[in-house]
């Protein structure tokens, strides 16, 4: 399926020369050269299939592939996620003159980043969000009020994955100018940039477009935060997404309740979208050239409940003010309670540290420790099940040998 007539290349999908060596090595491991495979990027994952994007003769092509585990660069089998680069081959007997053949992913290229979030259930492992993300955009509405705790948790996830993080404030036209200024000037710690796209003066996604230009950006936020509205605005420059009909909507949006600003889950699965290229632009149009080179957006479903990351170092990075005071404590294992020489308690006493922020830090650290313990217990159970299964198989083999011997 051809997406649109344009001058597309792999670079349009976020590829750059540093990936080339990994692709060549993966092809060699599979027993061929790069010319024997199609290099594609996973744009969506459904229950039974993947959607892949690649290019052919300057056109962006959408491919379909059955859902199956693929070997990664460690020789282990796992399922590709949105944002992954994969080597594929067409499946014989599929496709037609008007429809590309189905493809079979054979290898996943090494990931530069792997964004995950803890599962809301006790027994599940971390849930993948996207791979090879350069920047995480936290989309947070100004109405009824931004959740600092939620922003801090998203920020910690970004730090755990090694990606930059930006806070994008939406629905600023529903609060006073003073409130918007306050939200913009006093964000949660750890974010690299704070932008507001919606004010009394209109909806302006240009600062976000400039921020994500040439990068792969993932958008996370609660349901009704305005993620899909923002993505539509980035995909359709000059069109106000609040007043637009569904004619220009790539991502369908829905209304939110006036009482609490909450909405239904509009985006039901993660989807990777390519920012429009500079079609028809002149060679000297450097602005369009920059915006068309590898700018990729990943829209995600709204998150109702977000657990803390199990990476305590990422939490310390998010709460760098708290961890800075903690490093000055007399004892390295200080619990920041009643120990003598506690620099954190001193900062709380003299007003240098916000008590509410410190309490959020304590809760996240405690939750993180419980998640690590739960993960260890889960790994132990899995290992024990594998050990028991191997023992049973061994006993069956031994009994069959004894039976034959008799």
List each language-model region with its residue ranges.
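Helix-rich effector regions associated with P-loop NTPase G domains
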Residues: 1-8, 15, 33-36, 72-85, ...
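Structural detector for short beta-strands of small beta-barrel domains
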Residues: 36-48
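Conserved beta-strand segments of the P-loop GTPase G domain that flank and frequently precede/overlap
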Residues: 137-142, 168-170
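Walker A/P-loop
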Residues: 223, 228, 233
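Beta-strand/loop nucleic-acid-binding surfaces
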Residues: 59-79
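Canonical P-loop GTPase G-domain recognition
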Residues: 164, 171-225
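Histidine-anchored nucleotide/phosphate-binding helix
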Residues: 149-160
């Amino acid at each position: 399926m051809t997406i649109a007539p344009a001058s597309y290349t792999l670079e349009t999908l976020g590829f750059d020369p540093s990936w080339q060596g990994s692709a060549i090595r993966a092809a060699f491991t599979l027993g061929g050269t790069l010319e024997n495979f199609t290099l594609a990027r996973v744009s969506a994952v459904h229950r039974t299939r993947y959607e892949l994007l690649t290019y052919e003769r300057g056109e962006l092509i959408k491919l379909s592939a059955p859902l199956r585990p693929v070997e990664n660069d460690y020789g282990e089998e796992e399922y590709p996620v949105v944002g992954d680069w994969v080597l594929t081959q067409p499946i014989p007997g599929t496709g037609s003159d008007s429809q590309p053949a189905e493809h079979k992913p054979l290898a996943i290229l090494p990931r530069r980043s792997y964004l995950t979030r803890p599962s809301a259930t006790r027994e599940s492992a971390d849930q993948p969000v996207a791979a090879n993300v350069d920047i995480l955009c936290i989309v947070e509405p100004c109405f009824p009020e931004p959740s600092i705790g939620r922003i801090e948790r998203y920020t910690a996830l970004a730090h755990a994955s090694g990606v930059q993080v930006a806070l994008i404030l939406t629905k600023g036209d529903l609060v006073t100018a003073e409130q918007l200024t306050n939200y913009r000037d006093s964000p949660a710690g750890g974010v690299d940039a704070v932008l507001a796209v919606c004010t009394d003066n209109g909806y302006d996604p240009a600062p976000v477009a400039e921020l994500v230009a040439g990068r792969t950006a993932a958008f996370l936020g609660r349901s009704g935060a305005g993620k899909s509205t923002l993505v539509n605005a980035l995909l359709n420059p000059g069109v106000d997404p609040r007043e637009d009909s569904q004619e220009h909507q790539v991502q369908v949006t829905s209304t939110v309740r006036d009482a609490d600003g909450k909405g239904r889950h509009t985006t039901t699965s993660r989807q990777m979208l390519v920012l429009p290229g500079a079609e028809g632009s002149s060679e000297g149009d450097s602005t369009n050239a920059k915006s068309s080179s590898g700018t990729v957006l990943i829209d995600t479903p709204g998150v109702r409940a977000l657990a803390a990351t199990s990476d305590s170092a990422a939490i310390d990075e998010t709460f760098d003010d708290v961890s800075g005071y903690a490093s000055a404590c007399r004892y390295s294992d200080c619990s920041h309670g009643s120990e003598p020489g506690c620099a954190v308690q001193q900062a709380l006493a003299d007003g240098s540290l916000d008590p509410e922020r410190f309490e959020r830090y304590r809760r996240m650290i405690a939750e993180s420790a419980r998640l690590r313990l739960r993960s260890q217990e889960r790994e132990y159970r899995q290992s024990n099940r594998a050990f028991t299964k191997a023992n049973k198989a061994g006993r069956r083999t031994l009994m069959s040998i004894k039976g034959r011997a008799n």
